[in-house]
Amino acid sequence: MVSMLPKADAATGITRKSYAQLPEVVNVPNLIEMQLQSFVWFQEEGLRELIEEISPIKDFVGNRLELEFIGYEFREPRLSEYECTQRDQTYSVPLYVKARLIVKTTGEIKEPFDLFFGDIPLMTALGTFITSGTERVVVSQLLRSPGVYFTISDDPATGRPLCHTNLIPSRGAWLEFETSNRDVISVKIDGRRKIPVSTLLRAIGYSDDLDILNLFEVIDNDPERHYIQSSIDRDPLIKDEISALIDIYSRLRPGDPPNADNARKLINEMFFDPQHYDLGKVGRYKVNRRLELPDREVGDNRALTREDIVAIIKRIIMVNNGQDTPDDIDHLGNRRIRTVGELVQNQFRIGLVRLERVARERMSIVNLEVVTPSALVNIRPVVSAVKEFFGGSQLSQFMDQTNPLAEITNKRRLSAMGPGGLSRERAGFDVRDVHYSHYGRICPIETPEGPNIGLIGSLATYSRINRYGFVETPYRKVYSKLKNNDKKLVGLKLAAAVSDKDKVLASAGSVVSEENFKLISKLPECDIQVMPFVSAEVKYMPADEEDRYIIAQANTRLDENGYFLDERIEARLAERYVIEPPEKIDYMDVSPKQIFSVAASLIPFLEHDDANRALMGANMQRQAVPLLRAEAPMVATGMEREAARYSGQVIFAKRAGVAASVTSEKIIIRTAEGQDDEYLLKKFVRTNQGTCINQHAVINKGQKIEAGQVLADSSATENGELALGQNCVVAFMSWQGFNYEDAIILSERLVREDAFTSIHITKHELEAHDTKLGGEEITRDIPNVGEESLRELDEDGIIRIGAEVGPDDILVGKITPKGETELSAEEKLLRAIFGEKAREVKDTSLRMPHGEWGKVINVRVFSRENGDDLPARVNKWVQVWVAQKRKVSVGDKLAGRHGNKGVISIIAPVEDMPYLPDGTPVDVVLNPIGVPSRMNLGQILETHLGWAGHLLGFRVATPVFDGADDTAIEDALARSWLSAKAGATDMSPENKRPSTDTAKAVEWIKQQGFDGKKVFDERHPGLAKEVSLKLWLKDMGVDASSLSGAELEKKAYEVSSQSRLPSPIVGKSVLRDGRTGETFDQPVTVGNMYILKLIHLVEDKVHARATGPYSLISQQPLGGKAQFGGQRFGEMEVWAMYAYGTAHNLQEMLTIKSDDIAGRAKAYESIVKGEDVIQPGVPESFKVLVKELQSLGLAVEVINEEVKIAPSEKVAALTEANLPGSEDVSAEILPETLYAGAEDIEDSMMSVIDTDDQDLAMSSNDEEVSENDERS
């Protein structure tokens, strides 16, 4: 523990008091290393493997041409990352493959030639890809590993457990083995009909019954069950290799005539040819381990062998006989991760296979004398395969950039879905559930709440992925014995005496000295028993290897030399929890937070929260909007620094030096060698989610800089720590019912001081195209637009930077030529006088969308004249960025880090808020009823410890499962009370935060008869609490000098209950109502809580419509804010209107406010003229219903003189019952009759759809909709 008051961090200036009990043995690894390493592997090895797979390409006959690929290189990217984001381009590098062409007929070897193989998207230093100007992330895929799996299922008839086995290759046909209740082992090849396993054995060379029985005589020795004999007896007609081959061939190729040679070739191709069957490195490694085959080099034979099949059948018999355990398919030893490199490699392989096929076809037809490698190779399949993957794959995702944590989590995400994976419909409970093998590998907390729960996970903090794709986690090695010549023996305690014949060299319990070691090392090689100790040696282990060891928890008590302090240790062995003596412990966890992901380990007091609420807390932190004034949490966990570091949004100094220049856009550090390190800052950059990244320097010119020091913060960091929210003074109490159902009461102070104000940036684009009628023009000269609307536009018709814009304001003026019509004499005269100006153009300007506003912060113009690369038929392209400063408002969603979330119900004046005895009003009022049922008590502990830190003037770090306990929190509250009592707390308004004069407090405590230094020393837990309670009881007139421990607490509770005054350690205060000045009935929990504003902002959701677009068929208003739609008046709302008998309102809702076309047009006209609205007509949806019924051949009529839908005689003509002389219609002319009827039906349907244009033009922005359609 940290003593007294903590010192400020030299690099950041933040004072953090850490309550961690355990030392940091292993530093948090690079959190995005998985992405970076995987892509480097693809560039260096993955691509080479692919090129070796297809090289050389030969023609179909094999005697004309041969194309060899002998190497490849990536050249420099054409555009930088910044240029790609600005121009909506893809950040990529050109790939060139060196090819050599051999003309077989002449033996000529042509000069090697560099072939361009397309542009390959390049990963940025932050593990992302920029495609079409947007940042994307390729999510890693978690799927079943290639290999062999033995599972058990109960036979439905007998209830007997039987073995079922799958052999899954990386590429090729599956083999499925089954055992029947009659002891027959059968096999399915690629899902076809099953055959006895004896038939497959005969086909691969074990033709004789005796040969087959001899292979398994050692294993198949159960006197009651003879699996191999039963399988042989199952198919008595097949007795040799040829009949077995023909039988298998006829099942696999049922249409082809069977033939022994063809059959042998098919079997060899399907299983023993590496071109068609590939277990992969991983599959071969898993098969060798599971079948306990002799260790061959994994790359040696990636196809199947006869020995593999025999070994699989032996294992099936052992599992059936209970001599071997079945596999758990959800165990992480059986699931592997495909990282970005492998996913891109698989996609590239698809393109290369297509390329190879095209090249072979061209080889057969080209002229050998003039052939070149470029004439044979068509790179389009490769380019399209890669483009398709990055643009459209389920695993290539639009990066979540809401805040830095969201970015890191997106890069560390694991998905069980995607190509070759699961779908959410088929995935059951087992695959979604938390598995014991996830410990330290996949976070048990962080996963989505919806239908993807358990299918999408997140890597744990310390986990990494090995070369086979299995997740590993680190453990510290525990030694209880060492070799006698191991130098690590020096300084260790011996568990048993070491002797040489009769002479004792070192006694039990003694420490091995240098002299002792020299004597011991001369003994013949042997193991020396030492007292079990935890070394600093760290080993990363995959899940299947871990199952063999007993592993202690990270919080096991150790002394300073690493020896265990307890005689019995709580530990894990696979899925069991055991208590063992220290001698049996093999490894120990490196950290309590190794179980959790980054987001979960940012939740303080996670151990006191229910798992469901912790899940919500972890997910909601990713939705927090970066605020105008970033503030790091008062109560943190210590992971904030790591999250900010690896998000890439904080700039750290690479080398030490002096700040030579510090501006808003650039920092230059001059090193001791006189070299300049330049750091560019991002200014108001729009993220994918519309939030803002804005870096600002935290150093001054001339300041000395250390390597690794924070130079610049981002929008969501403070001094290099993640800062997603604000520290607020909260009170848990009811207040006028405004916090009913988790609603939140907010003080107006937070709005006034911009505590929860955030910046949101929208990007608007406009292109000027060439059309058939002429080119579009970006101009200030727009028809029928007043000067008022053009005042902020420059001479080119583009808005100026800094302009304030609102809904429907013009951002970029644009005119489009209209279709030319026959000109009248007057128009011809005007055209002759004014030339082109008088021609017909329409206004297609870019305007601010409805309901949006802000300030223009940037404008970029690209044009062909300036040499910019633009798409075909685009002459000019303008981008406008508009920033909004959004204050917090009623309806916004706020949340804590413990899954406690709510919507703001009222923003109350500061003077009305409840206030503390010193007059400080609280910032937020939360509902106490929201705590007990949710079981997230972490928020209460955070509130208490945050309050103590706030009053004592320091911030807190309390890591998950290793933080402050109840006593530490009570002591902190007691010290804050004692400091206030001593008058040592400076609460003056000019100070941003309160501060404590510890010396003054210590002196005052001394005057009261207690040791003040010990009270403020962490090495005396509980003392501060005891002293504060005694002094408080003394103030309350109770002598407690003789009381201590539980008695003292009991007495304090009694006095507090009677007096309704809180004791110093309960974290409560007597509050007064700001409106009346009276005290509330009971003391209220008041403290400091970290609150986040989530991206679900009410401003994005509030929407209103007067007139707008209508659906073409139903003629009802469209729905949703994006379509500028109306509010749905559904079935239940109609019932409510029925219930209240509001007939006229209901009629309006169902007619003129919806789809009565004529009625709504007349109603609009009546409102404009100030007349009464006339009687509604028939809704269009009713007419459509009638027409649909008529199209089914039903004679539906509307019996009403006013409503004309279809003449009754026409309806009658469409039905067979009323056809003239229908009983006389012969079979020959019936088709013509029906066809004529169908044509009539089609005509009547067209009359429904073909609605009048003027009715559709009711929409106020219908013209705009059609223009948008034209543009898109």
Swiss-Prot record:
The keyword Nucleotide-binding does not apply. PANTHER family: DNA-DIRECTED RNA POLYMERASE I SUBUNIT 2. It comes from Dehalococcoides mccartyi (strain ATCC BAA-2266 / KCTC 15142 / 195). Residues 1250-1272 are annotated as: Disordered. The gene is rpoB. The RNAP catalytic core consists of 2 alpha, 1 beta, 1 beta' and 1 omega subunit. When a sigma factor is associated with the core the holoenzyme is formed, which can initiate transcription. GO terms for molecular function: DNA binding; DNA-directed RNA polymerase activity; ribonucleoside binding. The lineage of its organism: Bacteria, Bacillati, Chloroflexota, Dehalococcoidia, Dehalococcoidales. GO terms for cellular component: DNA-directed RNA polymerase complex. Keywords: DNA-directed RNA polymerase, Nucleotidyltransferase, Transcription, Transferase. Gene3D superfamilies: 2.40.50.100, 3.90.1100.10, DNA-directed RNA polymerase, beta subunit, external 1 domain, DNA-directed RNA polymerase, subunit 2, domain 6, RNA polymerase alpha subunit dimerisation domain, RNA polymerase Rpb2, domain 2. It holds the Pfam family RNA_pol_Rpb2_1. Its EC number is 2.7.7.6. PROSITE patterns: RNA_POL_BETA. It catalyses: RNA(n) + a ribonucleoside 5'-triphosphate = RNA(n+1) + diphosphate. GO terms for biological process: DNA-templated transcription. This is DNA-directed RNA polymerase subunit beta.
